[in-house]
Amino acid sequence: MKTEISTADSLRDPPSNGLKADSELVIREDIDQFLPSEVSSLGSDHQNDGEDSDTDSDNFLQDPEDDVDEESTGRGTVTTTSTSTESRGRPSSCIFVASLAAALSDDELCLSVTENFKKYGDLARVKVLRDNANRPYAFVQYNNDHDAKHALIRAQGTLLNGRRLRCEPAKVNRTLYLKNQQSIDFNEISQICEKFGGLEQIVPDRTDNQYTRRYTYPISSANSWFVQFVYRDDAIRAYANLRTDPNWIIEWAQNINVPKNYNLLHKSKFKSSKYHQNNGIINNDGSNNNDNNNSNNNNREDSRRNGDVIEEECGHVHGSDSEEKLTSDGIYDDEDKDSEITIDKRSIFVGQLDKETTREELNRRFSTHGKIQDINLIFKPTNIFAFIKYETEEAAAAALESENHAIFLNKTMHVQYKEVGGRHNRKFSGKNGGSNFNHHQFFSTRSGKTFTGPELNLAPPPINMYRKMSGGSQQESETMMPYMPMGPMPMGPPPPNAASLSDFDMFPPSYSTFMKGMMPLRRKSMPNSWSSPSSKSVNSENESVNGGDENSELPSEIPESSGRYNAANSFTTYNNSSAGNSNNNNNNNNSNSNKSQYKKRYARRSSYGYNEVPPKPYYFQPYYYHPMQYHMGPMGPLHPSQGSAGNHHPYMMVYPMSPPPPSGLDGSMIPPPINVSQSHAANHGSTHVHANEFISNDTGDINEDNKAYSLDY
């Protein structure tokens, strides 16, 4: 089905494939696809109101008493069916109140603000919110501008709960930023948006316009537009309807402030009235054919002057499949609806209700916005919520705007549209989910623009169009290092060519089976036992504090008097010293180091060269006691003497540790013979041992300073 899109003031030039454009046949499916069935367009009822609707855009913010049943727009008059202007509340009648007491709850603040501001005028509602820093603020909505201005003057600087209030006119965001892959004319964008409510401003975005350097601002055709509504709930309803179409980019933007001549809604009042009378959509009797022909010829010249040439086959309404249908929301009826999210614009979700809530109370509260079809109140053990369905979209939008964050039974409610379906992932996607439009190529920012027009400043969207991500925060979802248990690790065998343990690492990567799949990064909270070029100073500091061992290249700066070691309060490490070396346990980590020392040793992550030196695995040393010297009798056949038969060799009694040392060690791994005094030489080979052999005046070489060891069994 080939569709021709009607422009507001001109006919499109025929496409390159030779299709003949029929100026009398205009199909408006591209506009009506975004509109629900119950929202009527500005049809023939307004064809004679064109000249009478030349109202200034500044007259939109007038008192509600002047238009109880109708709201005036620059394009005509839009009649409100189910929501009166008193219940909606104009943005000009809203006050922003800051500097509230953060110690109070939102419910208490809402009640106190209501009691304080209702004395200044007819109060409609009060909402209390908090920012990211947990600072509370409130929006106070009055029913007319006079009371709002009176409250701004009288309430400024007054005390409430021990705090001086700061009052300002509320900046109610009600502007949409619309972007399409095709260039859209001003009248088309106005027809699409004005059917959701009254409009204040329609301003083209100059940034993405392809005729930036050729023509002056403002232009009548662009790919992206700023549309500001009179009421926020109308903007919310338009946002919910248009955002579900994959060919549109709809963003909730901050309000724009441009001069009147940049507002095309104000400049084109006369053209818009001509459009309603002569575009052929309203008049079907042919009475204005001459006017149509003349206006079409003139508009065709204006279109060529502005470079406004668009193909008649629109990319988002084309298709040869007759079975392809559009829903009222403008979404293709695919078979993968489970993967997309839809908004039921007649139903609202009401959460955070009080446990005493009943259907009658909900009906009494929410029926003020429109006629209710159904109320589904659900009680959960920890949550109470309800789904309320209205007969019209206007009533649901008014309830969403009025009741969200409002007080009901002394609790703050949470109100939003009812969501149906899964995650929305169909933006710029084709019939079968394939991408048919490259957003970044087409909408790339162009340099050399000659006009500084309104810029897009995004604002938080009023409704949640997508589901929240489950799980923890981003920091919790980061890949963490594997946890290393605190316990003894088996010592791998040395390489074949290694002469001693000092010639190779304790656990090289090839011998570390438990470190498979370990990432080459290290968490800041975990100490490391490997050295990098940037951490040599840190390791040097540790070795100087711990004393090092006798074969260390860095001398110890700690005096010998401070070298007493308590074996019960530390973890010792394997090093290249023998079992009888008194310094074999000095290379350790001080478990009692304070926080400042920890920060010194382990600097920031940016100071480590991760990709320069591969990390060594973490190793937690097993606990063992110091070796003690005990002189034994003659060695039996199962314990041959390590020295000659004529030398007395004491047996080094070492407490066992798991696992036992591997067999087949090199000769350098065996402790060397220890020289003993000649007075004990005669004891070698005797049948009994004298008691004085175990006195403390032994002259062995293991402990030359006769340092006492505190053994904790």
UniProtKB/Swiss-Prot annotation:
Give a single Pfam family match.
RRM_1
Keyword vocabulary terms for this entry: Meiosis, Phosphoprotein, Repeat, RNA-binding, Sporulation, Ubl conjugation
Enumerate the PROSITE patterns for this protein. Answer: RRM
CDD domains attached to this UniProt entry: RRM1_RIM4_like, RRM2_RIM4_like, RRM_SF
Report the induction information. Answer: Expressed at elevated levels early in meiosis. Expression depends on IME1.
Modified residue Phosphoserine is at which positions? S525
The outcome of changing F139L is:
Leads to absolute sporulation defect
What ranges does the record list as Polar residues composition bias? 563-574
**MF-aspect GO terms:** mRNA binding; RNA binding; snRNA binding
Q: Which residue ranges does the record annotate as region Disordered?
A: 1-90, 276-337, 524-609
Per the record, GO CC terms? Answer: cytoplasm; nucleus
User: What function does the entry list?
Assistant: Positive regulator of sporulation-specific genes and of sporulation. Required for premeiotic DNA synthesis and meiotic chromosomal segregation. May act in a nutritional signaling pathway.
- Compositional bias, Basic and acidic residues, is annotated for 21-31, 299-327
Record field: compositional bias (Acidic residues): 50-71
**What biological process terms from GO does the record include?**
meiotic cell cycle; mRNA splicing, via spliceosome; premeiotic DNA replication; reciprocal meiotic recombination; sporulation resulting in formation of a cellular spore
Q: What is this protein called?
A: Meiotic activator RIM4
Species of origin: Saccharomyces cerevisiae (strain ATCC 204508 / S288c) (Baker's yeast)
Annotated SUPFAM superfamilies? RNA-binding domain, RBD
Provide the organism lineage as a comma list.
Answer: Eukaryota, Fungi, Dikarya, Ascomycota, Saccharomycotina
What Gene3D superfamilies has UniProt attached to this entry?
Answer: 3.30.70.330
Q: Where is the composition biased (Low complexity)?
A: 74-90, 278-298, 526-546, 575-594
- Give every RRM domain span: 93-172, 346-420
Explain the post-translational modification.
Polyubiquitinated by RSP5.
Q: Which gene encodes it?
A: RIM4
